[in-house]
């Protein structure tokens, strides 16, 4: 199945639950601020609304830009379920460690429940856990982000049920950076995740960090 169709099906399925039309959701996903989130990679992806219809428990409002590794939905691939995404939210929405922990957990609980419900599988999402710890310093930050932005880095571990391919328990590891951008008057959360434990010499994590390092935001002050 093509990736764009997969994402659209997730959105449409969750939309039916929230009594919105698919057209409304698609329009909302494209209603982004006058900024461009630039990923210098060949990885493909999508832009969707925050909160996404499949995770109505989330409180953050804005946009999410995603880039999926080749092999993202191939359980036999070395890049299975490895990807990067960015949350872009207005400057009045703080991205503290506590908020990040709650929002990421709500995101993945909703995602798993939405997909597994279509497969008649109980996600048991209340048992999902997401541990988050702030790192001593932020390393490999986006080179186009001003040093004055003072990015904060976190390491995380999610225990959940992977819903797309295996419908089995999975552990995802996270490397997250957040910063405020005065040029666009927005806060950003850059997330790298993979079922592979984080490692300096791991090829998957090296690529994820390269994508983050080359990421940039273009545009003027948004909403």
Regions found by a protein language model. Name each.
Residues 1-5:
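Positively charged n-region of N-terminal signal peptides that target proteins for export
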Residues 9-19:
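Bacterial N-terminal signal peptides
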Residues 22-27, 223:
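Low-complexity, Gly/Pro
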Residues 25-100:
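N-terminal Sec/ER secretory leader and immediately downstream segment
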Residues 55, 109-116, 216-220:
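Sec-exported extracytoplasmic/periplasmic mature domains
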Residues 71-162:
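Conserved polar/disulfide-associated segments of primarily extracytoplasmic proteins
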Residues 144-222:
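Short, well-structured beta-strand
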């Amino acid at each position: 199945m093509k990736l764009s169709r997969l994402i659209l099906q997730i959105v449409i399925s969750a939309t039916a639950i929230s009594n919105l039309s698919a057209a409304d959701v698609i329009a909302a996903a494209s209603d982004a601020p006058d900024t461009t989130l630039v990923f210098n990679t060949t990885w493909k992806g999508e832009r969707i609304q925050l909160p996404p219809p499949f995770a109505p428990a989330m409180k953050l409002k804005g946009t999410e830009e995603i880039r999926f590794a080749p092999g993202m939905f191939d359980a036999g691939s070395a890049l299975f379920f490895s990807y990067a995404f960015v949350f872009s939210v207005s400057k009045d929405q703080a991205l503290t460690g506590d908020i990040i922990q709650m929002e990421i957990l709500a995101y993945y609980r909703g995602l798993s429940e939405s997909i597994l419900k279509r497969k008649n599988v109980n996600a048991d999402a209340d048992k999902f856990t997401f541990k988050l710890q702030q790192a001593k310093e932020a390393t490999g930050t986006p080179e186009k982000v001003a040093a004055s932005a003072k990015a904060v880095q976190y390491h995380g571990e999610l225990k959940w049920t992977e819903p797309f391919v295996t419908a089995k328990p999975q552990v995802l590891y996270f490397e997250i950076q957040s910063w405020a951008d005065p040029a666009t008057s927005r806060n950003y959360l850059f997330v790298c995740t993979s079922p592979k434990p984080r490692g300096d010499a791991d090829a998957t994590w090296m690529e994820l960090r390269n994508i983050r390092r080359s990421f940039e935001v273009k545009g003027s002050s948004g909403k």
